């Protein structure tokens, strides 16, 4: 039992020993990466400064008036500035050039026996200057970028594009796609039209309207056209009586002014059509011709007209027009 309770001596756990030899290369790699990042940042800042300087010079040129030159004139101007007859961007110590060894982004100019050296000049900037002088481009082997000329041409066309855009906007302001209601024209038309108690009336006078009564095929005058109402029927659609034999034509199921006075009142009050009473037919009597009194020169009227008027009164009484005429 005592063997189970014996305590083992404490042995602390020890971690692996630090590798000094491996830490040194890691630190060196970190320092190299940091230096590379610093150099990259400095290079990026320099490039940004160069681009800003180029944009500033281009804006100054756009503000002034540039006189374009042809290729021959620009070549002669450049040849006059350089004793060797050309502008040489030096990329290193060239054989026979006589120039010291400089960096690849350095521009060297000679004018009147004096040499000018410009530091940090890119090939794009040199080509832009040559294009301003008259359209001369760099040689293919001088490190020029083809896309730079296109980018510069876009910048040169920018003022023209802005001018055209401003003209388009001015024209667009004058356009109005909404419908304009010309109240002045409507007012002129309304003033020319004739009115009767505030309502527009026909341009014809009352005398002309009275004389222009339209007669239907049956021979009944169309009085509704004079009053501005729809034309009335020549006869009642229910009982068949003529429009001239009734005091007025009234509204019916077929429309306005389609029933006689009696049928129209029945339809308006009760909503039904009245029963038409058919009386016995009246026999026609043959009356001898009228006799002429040659001595007195007086023509005696026959009883035909009186008989016809009596027949019409009998028909009207049978249809009930005499009893309804007072109600109308």
From Swiss-Prot:
Pfam families in the cross-refs: CCT, GATA, tify
InterPro entries according to UniProt: CCT_domain, TIFY-like, Tify_dom, Znf_GATA, Znf_NHR/GATA
Function, in words: Transcriptional activator that specifically binds 5'-GATA-3' or 5'-GAT-3' motifs within gene promoters.
Zinc finger (GATA-type) stretch: 236-263
Name of the protein in question: GATA transcription factor 17
GO cellular component terms, A-Z: nucleus
Segments of skewed composition (Acidic residues): 30-39, 47-63
Region named Disordered: 1-68, 198-231
Residue ranges of domain Tify in the record: 100-135
GO molecular function, one term: zinc ion binding
Source organism of this protein record: Oryza sativa subsp. japonica (Rice)
PANTHER family: GATA TRANSCRIPTION FACTOR 17 (PTHR46125:SF9), GATA TRANSCRIPTION FACTOR 28 (PTHR46125)
Stretches assigned to the CCT domain: 161-203
GO term, biological process aspect, one: regulation of DNA-templated transcription
Expression induction: By drought and salt stresses.
